[in-house]
Each structure stands twice: as structure tokens, then as C-alpha cells.
Amino acid sequence: LKAGDRSAKHIHPDLQDLFFVLEGEIEITIDGKKNRCTKEDFIFVEHLKSYELHALTDVRMLAMGCVIETQRTKLYPMLFEPNLHTKVWGSIDLTAWKELPRQNHIGESWEVSGIPNSPSVIANGTWAGYTLNEVIRKMPEAMLGKTVAQQHNNQLPILVKFIDTDDDLSVQVHPDDAMAHRMHSQHGKTEMWYVINAQPESYIYAGFKEQLTPEEYARKVADGTIMDALAKHEVHAGDVFYLPAGRIHAIGKGVLLAEVQQTSDITYRIYDYGRPGLDGKPRELHTELAAQALDFTVHQNYRNTYKDTMDMANLCLDTDHFSVRVLPLNYPMRRNMILYDSFVIITCVHSSCLIHIRSTQDEIELQEGFSCFIPAAIADYDIIPIMGDVKVLEAYINNRPRTTWQRIVSQFMHLSGYDI
């Protein structure tokens, strides 16, 4: 290495490294700890540890690696068994789109889930048959990222699902973290919708269009006129809506969308058109809890704007709970996400692609209508379209320090290696 040379951050899930300095001086940073090494010093880097090299002078080194691949440490992009949920407003269409055996009344497909009563089950590789939660418990930092594991108590903090509507959904709201912890000992539920397909004149409701007091809200719920106070949005493929906890919302019929949300299944149903459930009984309403959870703030625009540029990783949402990028690709793209210290969930919404892991050479095919989980320790990968263009979503936790200007600049810039 020449003086001043720096390497990118590396993590080897199945390899232990030994560096022996023959000549010169080098700084080797292991999991954030800097180690200064000179002639005849050696340093050992365990598997699953991140390291960076910085040559302080011209340096000659001997580097050795030992492959230690075992079942316990094997990491790769994970696919999942179908996790389908019956809904009164569901139909056969979602299973048809995913080319699964046809089932009626299917409204949701939980693509990557850590919800305890409905976790994702791994379908491929070493860990096939295990739940995602079980593997995370075995290797929390390698799977989630060190920061994510520490901040979220070794639990997957987001859920990705598909929703397909054959009828209007109930009008509902979700609590924020404070209320959810207080009332249910769970996380709150902030979410984002990405519209994959919508029939002509389909719509969603998001937010209020007029300012209401809690008393006015209660009256409108009681007399069945609450719909008149909601902001109604006609939707088209590619539309994005951010729904922070507390924002009233509903999806109309004829919409297929991907939802990224916090790991929570708490819903307060406000209005359900007087419709019975699949059991023939009226579905429960939660008007009092909803009144406590609601944010009555009126906004001018509830639709997210973002650039949908071909062959770019377009940032459409960046929040403390999760970040999401939209990637329409004609050509292969490298995605080095190691610096985020986070897992990545890739969801294919159009066509199909290969996901190729650079450190392990593992490769999977990701088809339209399916998702994969990339562990944090191997989040340096290529997305390779198979035939024509492909469109995928990336969901992850942004753990990089973010100043105000970085948040603004990141809306417009993309680097094919490390991202802002």
C-alpha cells in the first residue's frame, strides 16, 4: 500500500484474517477501534468483525485468511415461505400475482416478518425451516447490524408486506411508540405505502382535509360522516405515501401496494362501513383508542415526491424508523450498504433479478412479488436484471450520522458504491 491509501470497510462472515506488517506503518480499525501497527506487528481480525486499513506510510504486509464456514456462521440472502393473511376485503388476486396456489380472501402477504405470532420462515439454504427470528437470536449483530441489534433488543424492527384490495379497507389509525408501549407494551406503527398497481380511479385516504376538534371527530364517527373529512387521493403505480403513527388512513378497492412498517400489528379501527367479517359478525371498532392516537394536523400534501430515475437508487423515504429506496434498473448495480450497519430487505415489484453477494459469492433469483433478507454482515451485493428492466425496493435502517444538509442532499444524490 502507498502512504495515504485507505481500504473500504470489510466484513467477512466466513473468514478470519491475519495481517503481518513487513515494512512501514499502518492503522487498522476493527469495529471502530483503531490499532497502529509497525514492522513485525501482527493483528488478527475475527469473522463478522468490520475492519478498515489506512496506510500511514508506504507499507508491505502479509495477509492470510482462514475459511471457517460453519452452519452457525453461514450467512446468505434469505428467501421465505409464503405467509398469507385472510382478510374480509381480500381476494384470489394476490396469490395469482405471486403465482402461488390460488386462495380466496387473501388480502396480505407478509414478506419479511418478525411478528412473534406470524414470523417469516426461511425457504432456502442452511437455515431453511428456521424462522427468521430464530436465526436473528443466534447471530443478532451479524443479521441485524450492531447498532440495530442494540437499539431494538435483538429484534427485527420492520415488517414488509404486500396488500391487495378487492374492497375498501376500514378507516383506521395506529398508535405512536409512546402510546403503544403504554397501552400494549409493544412498538407503535409508522408505515409507508408504495403503489405497485391500481385500477382506474382507485384511491386511498390519507390524513384530514379539514381541521377537526376531537369533539367534531367523535360526532362524525357517530353519525357515519367521517369519510367526508378525509383527504382522498387517486393513485397510480409508483405513488408513495408516508403514514406516520397518528395519521388517519384507508386503502380503497383495486389497489396493489407494498407496505414497509414498524414491527407492530396494532390497528385502531374507526369506521368499517357496517360490514361483517368473514365470520358474519360485525368487526370491532376502537373509536376511543383511535381518538387518543389521532393527529388532527392538516397538511397540504400527503403524497411523497421523489425522483424515479432509471439505474439509480432513488431515496423516497428517510426516517428514524426506516428508510426506503426505489431502484428501477436496466443494468447491474453494485450496492455496498455495509456502512449503514443494517440489514437490507429487497422487494421485487416488477420482473426478476439476481442478488449476488460479493463476499461469499452466494446468489439467488428474486422474482416479482417476493422479497429477500440480506444480513448486515454481507450487505455488499449486486442487483442483476435477468430479462429487460427490473424494479426493486430496498428497506433498511439508516444508522449513518445525518445532519440536516445530508438529509437534503441524499434526496438528490446517489453513489454506486457507498451511499450518502
Predicted regions and their residues:
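C-terminal amphipathic alpha-helical segment
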Residues: Y268-Y340
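Loop-centered beta-sheet repeat module
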Residues: K220-R269
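Glycine- and acidic-residue-biased ligand/ion/polar-headgroup-sensing regions
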Residues: D14-I26, D31, I136-M139, D164-D168, ...
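Short acidic-glycine-tyrosine-enriched beta hairpin
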Residues: G32-L48, L230-Y242, I357-I378
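Tight coil/turn sites that cap or link beta-strands
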Residues: K2-G4, K39-E40, E46-L48, D176, ...
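Conserved short histidine dyad/triad with adjacent acidic residue
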Residues: L1-P13, L169-H181, V195-E201, D320-L339
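Transition-metal
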Residues: I68-L212, D272-Q300, V324, R400, ...
